[in-house]
A protein has these predicted regions:
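Short beta-strand->loop
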Residues: 112-118, 132-134, 162, 237, ...
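Periplasmic-binding protein-like
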Residues: 206-212, 249-275, 313
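A ligand-binding cleft/hinge motif common to bilobed small-molecule-binding domains
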Residues: 100-104, 231, 236-254
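Early extracytoplasmic/lumenal segment of secretory-pathway proteins
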Residues: 37-104
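A bilobed periplasmic-binding-protein/Venus flytrap-type ligand-binding module shared by bacterial periplasmic
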Residues: 144-149, 189-193, 267-279, 298
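Extracellular/periplasmic bilobal clamshell ligand-binding domains
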Residues: 316-357
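Mature extracytoplasmic/periplasmic domains
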Residues: 274-332
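Extracytoplasmic ligand-binding site segments that recognize negatively charged/polar headgroups
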Residues: 46-54, 91-231
Length: 357
């Protein structure tokens, strides 16, 4: 006969053992949670920019801060759409976009105020978009052309925005649509050169419809696709950003980038710390890190982003390929994003109906 004492003892021992196991498991879980590295979600454009960030920018930040950085690839309008879809429950911590969509994000209240840091004192005044957003790189919108193709045809290099109208380029011109910032800049410049501007865009549409559209082989939004058409010889000239031009030149392709005599247009790559933000402090630190001279120089070398940090020193050959230095930055044309963003949807509808059809 089994002793009642033994039964009670066995039962107590079993319960104590189970409790000990549960406590150990819970403690282990708490330890893992306490030591799990945080994750920072950084949204930015794809292609060469994404590869540069993943290989040359992010790893050092991860190591220094004990954080896992996930790069969320998408063009600027896609990133803005994600912020709108996730309003109030943002999954993105740091958003990097072209300045136009960034101004929209600011108007919609998606960015928190940037915390003070010494690096902000080193930036060009143009780089501070607002108390909540800063440029982290700068490019110029101008014209890129295949130097070898021009030489074979005996053509002089383009010098002006009006060269886009020349009928000798019929079906040899690549053009971004106005959903792309380069294309939008082109429309505004054609309006300005014909008596209009952001507040009177009609002259720009007229020039595109009558003179530029017949020259366009394809309306190309993706930078990689435009590069491919240039490399294949399908087009010999296109509206380009100086950063994209550097990326293509780095492959050995004979692309020349020119600043039109009327002026190239400033395009800034901007960043902000998204709100609400579970990793606010890390987000602010990441933006400051990207503005450091070391990372600014990496962006210039790899992707043609001109530094917005005035203390960065570039070798002359590299500096010549981008809007580098106070004089060059001051020469860039600016656009009125407040007016553009109010009208952009209307312009896009009109563009699809009358130009890109």
């Amino acid at each position: 006969m089994t002793s009642p004492y033994l039964v009670r003892t066995s039962s107590i021992s079993w319960r104590q053992g189970l409790s000990a196991l549960l406590l150990a498991a819970a403690t282990a879980g708490m330890t893992l949670t306490a030591h799990a590295e945080p994750t920072l979600y950084v949204a930015g454009v794809g292609g060469s920019t994404e590869q540069m960030y993943k290989t040359r920018v992010i790893p050092a930040f991860e190591k220094a801060h004990g954080v896992k950085v996930v790069y969320v690839s998408g063009n600027s309008t896609e990133t803005l759409a994600k912020l709108q879809a996730q309003k109030g429950r943002q999954q993105i911590n740091v958003a990097m976009m072209d300045d136009g969509p960034m101004y929209q994000a600011l108007q919609l209240g998606f960015c928190e105020k940037l915390t003070d840091a010494p690096v902000y004192q080193d930036l060009y005044p143009l780089a501070r978009l607002s108390p909540e957003a800063t440029a982290v790189g700068m490019v110029a919108t101008g014209i890129g052309y295949n130097e070898e193709a021009f030489k074979k045809r005996g053509w002089a290099a383009p010098t002006s925005w009006t060269d886009l109208e020349d009928p000798k380029y019929r079906q040899l011109l690549g053009m971004p649509p106005i959903t792309n910032t380069y294309g939008l800049h082109s429309l505004i410049e054609m309006a300005r050169l014909n008596g209009g501007g952001e507040k009177d865009i009609d002259p720009g549409f007229a020039v595109f419809e009558k003179k530029i559209a017949p020259n366009v082989l394809a309306w190309v939004s993706a930078p990689g696709e435009m590069d491919g058409m240039m490399q294949n010889g399908d087009v010999v000239m296109a509206v380009y950003g100086s950063g994209r031009a550097v990326a293509l030149q780095n492959t050995g392709f004979p692309l020349k980038f020119i600043y039109p005599k009327e002026g190239a247009v400033a395009l800034q790559v901007a960043a902000c710390s998204v709100t609400p933000n579970a990793q606010s402090e890390l987000s602010q630190q990441f933006i400051q890190y990207v503005l450091s001279p070391e990372i600014q120089k990496i962006q210039s070398e790899s992707n043609g982003f001109a530094p917005v940090n005035r203390t960065v020193k570039l070798p002359p050959e590299l500096a010549a390929r981008m809007p580098y230095g106070q004089e060059k930055v001051d020469s860039l044309l600016k656009v009125d994003w407040d007016t553009i963003n109010q009208k952009r949807s209307e312009w896009t509808t009109r563009w699809n109906r009358t130009i890109e059809r």
